[in-house]
Amino acid sequence: MIVYFQDVVTKNLIDLGPYGKSGMDVSPMDIPLKGDFIKDDLDRFWEVMGREHYWTGPTHHITLHLKQL
């Protein structure tokens, strides 16, 4: 599974890379984030595995996409 954030304002994608077979063996805190993200949002990261979720960033919304290879 490839995990990436999409900035819904600029449409830029930030690839978080593949993590194991399902990603479940990686702590959200281990994910190397780039850009303006709120770390506290990652507490809910694995709660939204497999579906799309919107988080409020410092200046805009960020969309989390999970794509199966």
Task: Set out the residue ranges of the language-model regions.
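Short beta-strand-centered aromatic/proline hotspots
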Residues: 44-53
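Short, basic/aromatic beta-hairpin or loop at an interaction surface
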Residues: 1-21
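Short, solvent-exposed secondary-structure boundary/capping segments
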Residues: 54-67
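Well-ordered beta-strand positions in beta-sheet-rich domains
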Residues: 23-25, 45
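Short, well-ordered loop/turn sites that connect or cap secondary structure elements
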Residues: 26-32
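A structural detector for beta-sheet-dominated domains
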Residues: 5-6, 27, 49, 65-69
